[in-house]
Structures are given as structure tokens and as C-alpha cells.
């Protein structure tokens, strides 16, 4: 056993000039992990208090992150209760004046919404989770404001315009616009082509201004006029100016009417020839 083993790194290293791990770096340290007596020993005491944060004494520090909420919150609340974290403040809401019969409300709707204490009798209406009540709903204040209990028009389901201030804000502006448009101009200045006697239609909207030229009513040719024009066309497709004047005087037509009729008749003949040529190929 005293012979040198060829597989010993301490013996092979100097022979082949290869520095092994134990001979080059740590000559006093072996691969088995044993520590020689010459090396100093370092002691690492175990600390129980690992956390540096100051937690309450009732909760021991165990190395796990602490929750942010002080009180335990159920992740699956029952359906009958609403989550307390999602509750809105009790002071939030919109107010509406009860509007007494004798006194008129001086505040508008926007001012009443901003001021919670609008009046001593202000009633708090809680917010509904379904969204705004009158979303996409347009109320006709002109029809529902003056109707009272007679039911002039159907109001919004949550905020009917029962206050005098709402009536004065909305219906007066709409009614004034209609009266201003009706009384500004002369009723006779706006004439409808379908109803020349009346200036305005049933809905109150004007048809045409007086400056616009109405279209002349179409007057078809009589059989006698068509027969004379067809006979002249068979004689000469392109009528002269002198012959056109003679036809217009004899048939009680204008020169422009005779000219346009001959143009249309030539185009009709051309279409008939093209149709016959197309049918001849088949």
C-alpha cells in the first residue's frame, strides 16, 4: 500500500505537467470537504428574527408576505350581500327639490346636482347600478310641461319635469323658437307647389321659397301633332330651320319643341337599328 498509485492526481500531476484542482488552487484543501486544522473556522449563528420590518407583536414573522388588508375579506361573498369593498359612499347621490306649489325653484338642474344641501327639504335619491335612467331618451318638454296631469306626453321614468324651473328652462326656449319662426316672415311669402293657397304645410315647415322656379307641367303631343311630325320625319330626318318654323306655326308648337322632337326621333331610330343588328347575329 506504500506504492504510489498511478491514478492519484497528486502523483500524475507533476509527471505530465498538469495542475490539478487540489495541487494548483488549494493545496491544503481536499475534495472530500474535510478542513485542515490550519484554516480558520467561521461560525454563522442562526437568526430567528429574519424580517427587518416592524410587524405587530400579535402576528409572528414567519418569512411570508403579509396581506395588505387589515381585516380578513371573503373571496366568495354570498349572493345576498354586496361586497363591502365596492360600496360607494353614503353621501354620494343626486338631489331633487320637492317643489312646493307656491314657491318657484330658483336653482337649475345642474346647480341642484352640485349642491347637496340645496334646500331644507332636499331628498336624497340613491344611485342605481343599472346606469343613467334616461340614457338615449329625449323628453319633449313642450308637450309634457304644460299638459299637467292630462298626459300631454310620456316623461322619463325617473325624473319627471314637475318643477317650475325645468318648465321655464326647457319649454320656453322651444316655444319661443317656434313662435319666432312663424311670426318673423309673411305667411304669403312661402308657397308650396302642391298647395298654392297655403303658405305652410300641415307640419309647419315651408316647401319652396318664392324665388325658386317651379317645374312646368308636361303637356303631351296630340295625335294630330304626332302624325304631322312623323310624316315630316319620313320625308326628311334633318329638318331645316324654315320648315321647322312652318311646322311649329301650323301645329301650335314652339320652335324648341319641334327641334327636340326630331332629335329624340333620330335617337329612337338609331336604337332600333342597333337592336336589329344585335338580333341578326342570333
From Swiss-Prot:
Establish whether keyword Isomerase is in the entry.
Answer: no
Report the DNA-binding ranges.
Answer: 214-273
Where is this protein found?
Answer: Nucleus
Q: Where is the composition biased (Low complexity)?
A: 162-175
The UniProt entry, under SMART domains, shows: HOX
Q: Got a GO cellular component term for this one?
A: nucleus
Indicate whether Calcium appears among the record's keywords. Answer: no
**Family listed:** Belongs to the Abd-B homeobox family.
**Role of this protein:** Sequence-specific transcription factor which is part of a developmental regulatory system that provides cells with specific positional identities on the anterior-posterior axis.
What name does UniProt use for this protein?
Homeobox protein Hox-C12
Q: Which organism is it from?
A: Homo sapiens (Human)
Source gene? HOXC12
Amino acid at each position: 500500500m506504500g506504492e504510489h498509485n498511478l491514478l492519484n492526481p497528486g502523483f500524475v500531476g507533476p509527471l505530465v505537467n498538469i495542475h490539478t484542482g487540489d495541487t494548483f488552487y488549494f493545496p491544503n484543501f481536499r475534495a472530500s470537504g474535510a478542513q485542515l486544522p490550519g484554516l480558520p473556522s467561521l461560525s454563522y449563528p442562526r437568526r430567528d428574527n429574519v424580517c427587518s420590518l416592524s410587524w405587530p407583536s400579535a402576528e409572528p414573522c414567519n418569512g411570508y408576505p403579509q396581506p395588505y388588508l387589515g381585516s380578513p375579506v371573503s373571496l366568495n361573498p354570498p349572493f345576498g350581500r354586496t361586497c363591502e369593498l365596492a360600496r360607494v359612499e353614503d353621501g354620494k347621490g343626486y338631489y331633487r327639490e320637492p317643489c312646493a306649489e307656491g314657491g318657484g325653484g330658483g336653482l337649475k338642474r345642474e346647480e341642484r346636482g352640485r349642491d347637496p344641501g340645496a334646500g331644507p327639504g332636499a331628498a336624497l335619491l340613491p344611485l342605481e347600478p343599472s346606469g343613467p335612467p334616461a340614457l338615449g331618451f329625449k323628453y319633449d318638454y313642450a308637450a309634457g310641461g304644460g299638459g299637467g296631469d292630462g298626459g300631454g306626453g310620456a316623461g322619463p321614468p325617473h325624473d319627471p319635469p314637475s318643477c317650475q324651473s325645468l318648465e321655464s328652462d326647457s319649454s320656453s326656449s322651444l316655444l319661443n323658437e317656434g313662435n319666432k319662426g312663424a311670426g318673423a316672415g309673411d305667411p304669403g311669402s312661402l308657397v308650396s307647389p302642391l298647395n298654392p293657397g297655403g303658405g305652410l304645410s300641415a307640419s309647419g315647415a315651408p316647401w319652396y321659397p318664392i324665388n325658386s322656379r317651379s317645374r312646368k307641367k308636361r303637356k303631351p303631343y296630340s295625335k294630330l301633332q304626332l302624325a304631322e311630325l312623323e310624316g315630316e320625319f319620313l320625308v326628311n330626318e334633318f329638318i331645316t330651320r324654315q320648315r321647322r318654323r312652318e311646322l311649329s306655326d301650323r301645329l301650335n308648337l314652339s320652335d324648341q319643341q319641334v327641334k327636340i322632337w326630331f332629335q329624340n326621333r333620330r335617337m329612337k331610330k338609331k336604337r332600333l337599328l342597333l337592336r336589329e343588328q344585335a338580333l341578326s347575329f342570333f
